[in-house]
Amino acid sequence: VLSHDLEPNRAYAEVTRTARELKEVGPRLVNLKKNNKVALLYSIDSFHAIQYMPFDDRVNYQTVLHQMYGALYRLNAGVDFVFPNSTNFSDYKLIVVPPLYVADDALLKRLAEFVRQGGHLVVAFKSGFANEYSTVRWTKAPGPLREAAGFYYQEFANIRQPLKLKGDPLGIGDENNKVSVWAEFIIPETAEALANYDHPFYGKWPALTRNKYGKGTLTYEGTYLTDKLQEKILLDALNLAGLAGPDQQLSASVRVRHGVSNMGKNLHYYLNYSSSKQTFTYPYASGTDMLTRKRVDKSQAVELGPWDLALIEER
């Protein structure tokens, strides 16, 4: 913290301020409880299987996982990680699934039941293809997910050059309206095609589908998306799940996270990750900024200084 002169400096002042603030409010922040309604399913078996038998030298399991998580982060959606052996799928309204290449029938049936009961799934390509032993299923893909997904496929291909989607169906602009790396030749049964390839051969099959199954929906990505396209798909899924709101309307540099304190009060953390001032309209119940001790009312304009934060505790 101190430089070679051992004198207080800018960094020392920052650390001092942080320590003072933590001393003042820290006891009310410990044991923070999160109630996220979005989960990301992480499969270490799928990670290793795809590493062992890669489908591309540019994209792998981690690439898609990071893309999906990054999109949710930019959308200000709080995310939990769940795993194939997790038993709490019903705690969530939306589960996002990177390529679930390795999965037993029981897991895929649990995901289908999650949708049937009113949950929403966003599932990446190659999911449901192999069983728990990384052996390709002797059935049409995506195996036990077929009914919930509303389609099947028997063929797939590598795409060496990006392909555009026909007609910019998600309204993201020409630069981001393209896919690459992988294409599954999806044959819809009950699923709706959200987007098709703009190509004389691949255009026969949808790139993105959505199926209503029971009380929920399953959105499927049969190809590798651009970051903006992934973000738009996940924003649509948040809307379907009833989870989109004012947090998704904040400026790109403002992040917000929520929790419940050990005193049972709702906390809202707003962080400005930019060198310019940011102003937003506070949408939650009236409270107090724990750092400035100023009252903050619902619908009040709140200003964040560069690289600053507001920590609002509801009354």
Task: Describe each model-derived feature in a short phrase.
Residues V1-R315:
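Carbohydrate-binding surfaces of carbohydrate-active enzymes
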